């Protein structure tokens, strides 16, 4: 009974006495920041009015959002599933309603665009989604037409209720791709049999009855979408590059295609290019405009006019980048973006400042604009005449990128002239919102490639000039070269520099104290970057999936530099390595990015300065073979750059840098350099040893049967982590020594059988040097996804228990015992005994999106697990709660060690969330880095959003808190000094008076 009471007491103590990680209201945003993104635009709709303040977008990240057109901030956002089920297939905006179709045509939703509220949601029948259209009747839009592979359905716009559904004739052989209506009481469905004929079915809007069905032969046409368009009053126009002509068909009256040859010699179809008709329909209750664009090649457009069976050329654009239509009131304009060949004073897309680039580009490539300067002009669609004072010129910072999408927001000014704004999206996922304002063309910009961060590193900022001068005093070279007198003079000069810096800092403090807080500018630019006192401010080097690199200042989230890799394919993999830090002044810091193309397996290296974002003058080696593994060795060259080893598919090693000094060191250290390779498809893990001639030798091999289980994750320890304590003091005052094997690999496997009764998760702890299996365990009736953290002497991994239908965490800890085998040096080749492995499992009440452990400079601070939840919260869980040594029944020794009694449930307390309400949508990873304070760990969580903060696993034991009352303690000290002086004087007077007596 007493044991039960004691156990209950300890459980309640563990639950109630939890370390709080909350923040006060005045601390919100002081040490942390969050940046929200929506992703690359897939569909967009801009309001056509002068006072419009929002634009509605649907993105490739399955996000529907509204952006403030004045600032670019997100007004509201809805994040759907990250899989294909949440993909937005189509979006239409009418008035205050945005209609979206997602999940392959399974869900249709209506959104209120002002506040983002859901008006209605309906589930559609199964079938391949093809097209979406608005259907007008009697000068009002009432219905939504949904075209699928076999059916055409009509739904009420106000409620989403089904009006009628009709099966399409011969849908098993005809591929229906287009739907069209213009308020005449009918709706057309257009389908095609490739290289055969086009089938046109006409439905009555009221009852869905088939009014007419027409079949026309088109032996030259393969697709309707991406080729044909409907112009004027229901006239289908299809280009035919083989006959250099256009084919038209009036859907109301004609039964055969009419061929119209293109008479102009300037209208030549591009070789191997599928020409495309780009029409515009300003209103669903009105016919399409008779004017349309014909795209003849990737950069050649022509504005044509259809009238009574004839097509006339209004304007030819042989070198156009993008085109778009826009309508306001009764005016419809065409926007054309072209590359500006002569650049005088373009406006930079970064900050809007005017710069001079007097250059003239040569012959233009079909898609490239070598000077990266573009111009947008408006043209009247009726005549093709360019409108005066409608030109906007802008330039892109990054070379190799180009605009991909153009959306126009046009409106009428007070003098009845046309004004407009433009939304441009580039190849590197940059969104620019442009306006007609001299000096500030770029109203705002958004770097949406940051919604897909793939790897991240934090680099220490460089020292200031005064700090570098002070550091240089203590070098060995300085002592030899300068001598005693020279060092004394250098000390005086450095102290004068520090005094000058301190004086300017005081002056700035007094100057800012006279201003309101809102007017104090703490702008951070790349020229004033310097390491702070506690090294809390760092440079976040971020690599995105689009091939864009960013340098972000960690304390504010300010983007200081960016670079774009133009030839990176979408599915490439990246690995970022810091070869030289800022600690080796005057040598600049150096980062190396390894990019691997998954299709070809070929890789390339990019070397750059992580502080300034400039490409390095050091030429990396050209990689002619696919790279299997890369290793960053602690070996340095004469310029303090770590050596990078690259292993190709022939198991040959390339060193970078490959100087004579490096090759000599590799020749000496080759017997102690080992690495491993993983072939997940074959289930093979191989260990190799480096030879002195930079070839490799197979040292061990382990095969996991791929027909039974597959390798899903292999993770080693972080090379930068420090372990402060070699063991744990037990209750009897003995020491339980940790098994700190730096070569240990944690390998996670998952069964190939998907039946819930036969699934399992396996974990192997393997020595990467010898291939020895240190430990293996199997979790039966479990499946992934598995999240793993491997640090010090412990491993924590999460999985789904399919039998109990819950998420579980399993913790493993490795110990050598009460006697340490070798305290001075570790060797995998000299370990006769296997370590003791302790294991314990816990129930976690939520699934996990990402998991990482905190890290500090010396490893003294207690470790916490940072767990990203699907809700976007980040839980800071003390590692002590996942201690495998937690006893079921507490003993005197366990109480002496402060071990919490074992309880299988891990409670999630809101006060342990380090990001309070700053949730991170669709979190993919958490990155941790040490700071100059042992108590502080820097954390970056990334996914659709980016969130940066600081955590204090053991509280702030090495720095004063923010609420420390300096005035009070100073007053007390001055009061004590003053009281001491008065008391001393009174005591002297008293002694003098006593002496006179």
UniProtKB/Swiss-Prot annotation:
GO terms for cellular component: EMC complex; endoplasmic reticulum; endoplasmic reticulum membrane; membrane; protein-containing complex. The chain crosses the membrane at residues 967-987. GO terms for molecular function: membrane insertase activity. It comes from the Eukaryota. Residues 988-997 are cytoplasmic. Residues 1-23 form the signal peptide. It is found in: Endoplasmic reticulum membrane. Component of the ER membrane protein complex (EMC). GO terms for biological process: protein insertion into ER membrane by stop-transfer membrane-anchor sequence; tail-anchored membrane protein insertion into ER membrane. Keywords: Disulfide bond, Endoplasmic reticulum, Glycoprotein, Membrane, Signal, Transmembrane, Transmembrane helix. InterPro entries: EMC1, EMC1_C, Quinoprotein_ADH-like_sf, WD40/YVTN_repeat-like_dom_sf. Residues 24-966 are lumenal. It is a single-pass type I membrane protein. This is ER membrane protein complex subunit 1. It comes from Mus musculus (Mouse).
